[in-house]
């Protein structure tokens, strides 16, 4: 019996519910015994009353993607999809992820962490900047800062979600994402947005976003991204499945942006799109993720 864990109380709850419902329907379509569990982010006593031996985690953001739910399942020897508690803890924190990636000599935009509790250190890289909460996904709470005067408002927005924000040099270029399944990188997807950057509204509510798969890169360029994505994925000890986001500047230099250890599985989501490009249906993708447990 598989428990499909969705919901949570993070800022990504609505997305998680959509992802969870899609995964649940895929399992039902294949006559796989399962049930939905909408966790509201508090105690798990109702979950432990159910009989199940595996969990498909589609809890996005804090509580589901930060190692908490993974640790609870580990303590009960219940197998689950995706990365373990330690890798999840590393992956959700953008600042921690960057430290690990730097140790592996991966290419990143310059950045600093700004805490609500202390003065901001001098920023020694040029404008514009991207400001984002360190512990949120789906581009929630992010802002582009074009002048010093805009920084305070951007930080106040990011600090609504947690007490630390990442101030990162803005890299002008094209956005790409690489889905990973097991030890393989899936076809690269290019993201074209009219918003200036790929924010929450673009991801889940806009019909003006274009996704290209094939992505338009040469086979050698695509392979470079896939190799870097796998290095980034395994650097934080991620496993099972995930997604790594990039931007390529005007000099064709790729920069890592972030990693998602529990990516979206909605109709707009990019992992299903990449899987489809290699001939894998949504139903088969769901089973493939389970098989990586």
Curated annotation (Swiss-Prot):
The reaction(s) annotated as catalysed by this protein in its Swiss-Prot or TrEMBL entry are:
2 D-alanine + ATP = D-alanyl-D-alanine + ADP + phosphate + H(+)
Query: What GO cellular component entries does it have?
Result: cytosol
Can you provide one Gene Ontology molecular function annotated for this UniProt record?
Answer: ATP binding
A Pfam family of this chain = Dala_Dala_lig_C
Q: Give the EC number.
A: 6.3.2.4
Locate the residues binding Mg(2+) 2.
Answer: 258, 260
Domain ATP-grasp residue range list: 98-291
Described purpose of this protein according to its UniProt entry: Cell wall formation.
Return the protein name: D-alanine--D-alanine ligase
Q: Which organism is it from?
A: Ruthia magnifica subsp. Calyptogena magnifica
């Amino acid at each position: 019996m598989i428990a499909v864990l969705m919901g949570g109380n993070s800022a990504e709850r609505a997305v998680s519910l959509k992802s969870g419902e899609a995964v649940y329907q895929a399992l039902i379509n294949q006559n796989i015994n399962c049930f939905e569990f909408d966790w509201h982010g508090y105690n798990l006593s109702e979950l432990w009353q159910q009989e199940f031996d595996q969990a498909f985690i589609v809890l996005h953001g804090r509580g589901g993607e930060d190692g908490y739910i993974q640790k609870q399942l580990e303590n009960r020897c219940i197998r689950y999809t995706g990365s373990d508690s330690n890798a999840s803890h590393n992956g959700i924190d953008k600042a921690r992820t960057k430290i690990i990636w730097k140790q592996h000599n991966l290419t990143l935009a310059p950045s600093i962490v700004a805490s609500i509790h202390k003065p901001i250190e001098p920023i020694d890289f040029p404008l514009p900047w991207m400001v984002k909460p360190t512990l949120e996904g789906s581009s929630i709470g992010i802002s582009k800062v074009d002048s010093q005067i805009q920084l305070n408002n951007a930080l106040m927005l990011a600090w609504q979600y947690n007490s630390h924000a990442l101030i990162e040099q803005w890299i002008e270029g094209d956005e790409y994402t690489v889905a990973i399944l097991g030890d393989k990188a899936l076809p690269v997807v290019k993201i074209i947005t009219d918003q200036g950057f790929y924010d929450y509204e673009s991801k889940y509510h806009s019909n003006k976003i274009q996704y290209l798969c094939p992505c338009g890169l040469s086979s050698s360029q695509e392979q470079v991204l896939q190799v870097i994505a796998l290095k980034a994925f395994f650097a934080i000890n991620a496993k099972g499945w995930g997604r790594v986001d990039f931007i390529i500047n005007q000099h064709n230099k790729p920069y890592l942006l972030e990693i998602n250890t529990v990516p979206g599985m909605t109709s707009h989501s990019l992992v299903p799109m990449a899987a489809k490009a290699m001939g894998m249906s949504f139903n088969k993708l769901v089973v493939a993720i389970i098989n990586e447990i």
